[in-house]
Structures are given as structure tokens and as C-alpha cells.
């Protein structure tokens, strides 16, 4: 009887500490580092094309990730992680004065992979996007970039769930930073 009560208490504690919530990532904001790097790169103005999920991938990969039990994280951009990549890049380009809806150069992207694992011990997340830069009919850049993160993930869901969402959101800034730093990308948009 005592063992059963202990197990029941443990199960109730797990349910209580994990709860259930639908977390929406914050609206992308420009970072000082990415904006500065864009301004220093001497790039031509550009516009953004479509950002979509790769054909054949499960739609859920673009919609949300489970965070222990009934908790989920989703993007504020029409519920699409691909659109969140686009918006993350858009705010950086706009902050650097490089966004022009009439520009010849177009940046587009395809979400190839999106993973989030908030397991106890070590949490992990990654996103992979294939970016393309075209000017007119000429493809000037095409490359898949991946951003990864690992963090200490608490046993307690009340700590681990927001931490996982925060680290996952940070991957988008990191990915945009990788794109901006890529010499081939800079060459494709050089003035």
C-alpha cells in the first residue's frame, strides 16, 4: 500500500510540474551583432521571397514541437517555423537598411529540418534551412546551413519547458548570423 501511494505521489508530481501549455515564440528582433555585420558587409539591397517547408517533409515539422507531455512551442508567424526564419532575416535586413521590395536580388529559403528535444539532463535543438539568392534568373547562392544548441535540461518541467523554448528560439538568430557571416552569401549580394 505504501509503495503504491509513493508511486501515485510521484506520478502526480510529474503531472503537476510539467503542466500543459502552448508556448508561442517571441516576435523576432534584430540583434546588434547581426545588424552591425550586415552594415559592414557592403551588401546590395535585397528583398525576400518565399520561405517554405521542404516538399515531402511532415507538416508538423513546420507547425510546432512537443515539450514534454502536452506542452508545445510554435512560431508567431502564421504558426510556421519557415516563416519565422523569413521574419528573423527580414528584421535584420530592415535594421541594416538593406531591405527593398523592388530590389533585383531575392533571398528565399526552404526549411529542411527542425528538431527540439527537451529531455531531462541535456536538451538539444537544431534547424536546417537551404537559403537561395537569385538575381534576375541567375542563382547566385544556394547552401544549406544548420544551427544547433545543447543546454542543461532540468528534471522539473516548469524550468525545462521555458528553457527549451528559449534555446530553440535562439537558434533562429544563430542561423541568420551564420548566413550573414558566410563569405559566399556576401559575395552573392556584393554591391
Would you name each region that the model predicts?
Residues 1-20:
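Sec-dependent bacterial lipoprotein signal peptides
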Residues 20-83, 184-191:
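A structural "domain/chain start" motif
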Residues 21-33, 95-162:
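Surface-exposed short loop/turn segments
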Residues 53-56, 128-133, 151, 167-172:
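Short alpha-helical linear motifs
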Residues 63-78, 138-181:
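Short secondary-structure boundary motifs at beta->alpha junctions and helix caps
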Residues 75-99, 109:
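Mid-chain, structured segments of secreted extracytoplasmic proteins
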Residues 90, 94-98, 176-185:
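Sec-exported extracytoplasmic/periplasmic mature domains
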